Amino acid sequence: MKNVLAIILGGGAGSRLYPLTKQRAKPAVPLAGKYRLIDIPVSNCINADINKIYVLTQFNSASLNRHLSQTYNLSSGFGNGFVEVLAAQITPENPNWFQGTADAVRQYLWLIKEWDVDEYLILSGDHLYRMDYSQFIQRHRDTNADITLSVLPIDEKRASDFGLMKLDGSGRVVEFSEKPKGDELRAMQVDTTILGLDPVAAAAQPFIASMGIYVFKRDVLIDLLSHHPEQTDFGKEVIPAAATRYNTQAFLFNDYWEDIGTIASFYEANLALTQQPSPPFSFYDEQAPIYTRARYLPPTKLLDCQVTQSIIGEGCILKQCTVQNSVLGIRSRIEADCVIQDALLMGADFYETSELRHQNRANGKVPMGIGSGSTIRRAIVDKNAHIGQNVQIVNKDHVEEADREDLGFMIRSGIVVVVKGAVIPDNTVI
């Protein structure tokens, strides 16, 4: 796989994940207690021996830059591997920001063309899955494809959110429709037994959806982006237009895959990691590990706690609390008599000293972490939050959507999201 260049699309402003993207690019959003979203595609690349990786991003790229530079030094040992962020920039030749996924790649085509590779692997930065890209690329080569799409069978409920396609008997894409609705959606229904599904599974999942993951022959991608500047998005324009003109093949991926680009899907995917005995996605795979930055934190300390079906990152301090079906990020601090249930706590970037905590409390300020006697249920608490004593974050009025950013929180799809660094005073009820 040395002749493959991977390009990870960092996405736009991440408005569907706001406020988690308020101060960070979407690929830098924390995941599963200690990782970041970008670790998923980068780890999949490394495990497939793909070591030339660009990450394209447009907004708030400082923390993403820092994470990648501190984590992935692929050139050690005198190799030519790298993981590098390419941020959108205004130039005299191009006075515009990225206009879409394809336009993002087009704006850096001058750099991408310099690499002597056979294929370009286009990936997304906000999916949770484990894939062997070497099998994907080998399928592309074996079929002599110009473009290969990674696809999965899908049910009708979710089908309209994806690009759908029809295939011939050889697996070639003969029709492609991006996020069809109504009659157009029904027209894209196919017999998915051609993908190897049994009749029962095929009846439940009668659509073939694109995962937004592509392999292009080098010259094909350069030609498409150079000669069709009006096409700014891969899924909406480039792929539908190219599907009939080029040998476009489909590669079946029939394992766990989740688009976690919204607050609701992000929350559900994180909490699903706690399911027993078999979570839909596991970070405990020695054959295909997910990498992240080594932080050298101390072990987590639990003092008379009751913890059930939860994931707790390293370096946490928990005192006489109850934690149920939750994910706690690194350096989380939870004081006595707290109840954490169905919650995602992202932890902290640093420790407050004991002296500072006592000083803050003496001065009427709220220390970092979860104060004693507090309850957090069905919520996301971003990093470095200061939650006071006897706080109730339970969405007591069952609100679906609310913007209270000035008070330190928002509600999305019924999930309370406490913003990064927020201060929630003692006795607050949300």
Curated annotation (Swiss-Prot):
A molecular function (GO) term: structural constituent of carboxysome shell
Catalyzed reactions: alpha-D-glucose 1-phosphate + ATP + H(+) = ADP-alpha-D-glucose + diphosphate
Residues holding alpha-D-glucose 1-phosphate: G163, E178, K179, S210
Entries under CDD domains matching the protein: ADP_Glucose_PP (cd02508), LbH_G1P_AT_C (cd04651)
EC number(s) on file: 2.7.7.27
Annotated keywords: ATP-binding, Carbohydrate metabolism, Glycogen biosynthesis, Glycogen metabolism, Nucleotide-binding, Nucleotidyltransferase, Transferase
Pathways per UniProt: Glycan biosynthesis; glycogen biosynthesis
Family in the record: Belongs to the bacterial/plant glucose-1-phosphate adenylyltransferase family.
Subunit details: Homotetramer.
Identification of the protein by name: Glucose-1-phosphate adenylyltransferase
Organism from which the protein derives: Synechococcus elongatus (strain ATCC 33912 / PCC 7942 / FACHB-805) (Anacystis nidulans R2)
This protein's encoding gene: glgC
